[in-house]
Amino acid sequence: ATTLQKPETVARAMYRAAGQLSSPGRGSYPATRAAEETDLQCRTLAAKLFGVTDPARVVFTSCATHGLNIAVHSLVKPGATVLLSGYEHNAVTRPLASIADVRLRVVRAPLFCPNLFLEELERRLTPEVDVVICTHVSNVFGYVLPVEEVAALCRRRQVPLIVDASQSAGVLPVRMEDWGAAFVAMPGHKGLYGPQGTGLLLCQAGGEPLIAGGTGSLSRQPEMPDFLPDRLEAGTHNVPGVAGLLEGLRFLRRRGIHSLFCHEAALVRQAAEGLAQLPRVQVYSAGGKGCQSGVLSFRVAGRDPGWVAEELGQRGIAVRAGLHCAPLAHATGGTEAT
């Protein structure tokens, strides 16, 4: 679900940036020009990797949660009806809870059954729905939702779509313009191999800024600029973070998204098969259905998950126990009681 181990080039780039780069858009001397070039290279490479024609529509954020908050508050107004895929993280559900009188609909379909999911989604996507929010890959189960088909349905019904690509960016193809999504949010520190505190928001058009402030552009104007990326990027950039993220994206381009996914999928199959041989262990696996990424959940009957995680941690095995900040996913997957 995250990448603790980074390419060495990421740390080196961050160290260089901390000592050699200034703030982009805040001058014309070499250090700020170099920061501007780093920003541009990062946006341009991200745009190529994720199907965005104009790099200006790649917005830097502090994390996927930041980007999802922008997306939600840009599209969801008080009293709106929102259709959720059922696997949303609190980064989606809590912003929705902060908006008055929002009506939520949730797709309920069995785990790892994309065809049934699509049938239920289509049934619930009635004319009353104002926005659809779809998690591309569940951070709890690794379930790969059929986002291409979801996007096609949203285009036909002319309903704006927000995609949470937190677990899929860098792991599966993300094609923002092909999908026609209004927003696609992703963190830098997971499949993009960048540092914590970085993220990207891919925007079809503008959005509503969460914070206002200096951008280095239109400084006489009291309002935020109406063009991207400045409209959504108030304040000083995380320049070392962007430099590290750029190197993470370069690593991803060199290795190839498909090749990294195949490696992760092989490891997941191996882990699932091994765990399934152990007594009292229930594994939540897609088997051979091909709709699971590099995230695997399991439970040990009669044992508290926190105790299991502690025991494994003492043996050098890193796992996470609990709700994973996604109680809705547990409710949809039928694992709330575990």
Model regions and ranges:
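Pyridoxal 5′-phosphate
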Residues: A1-T338
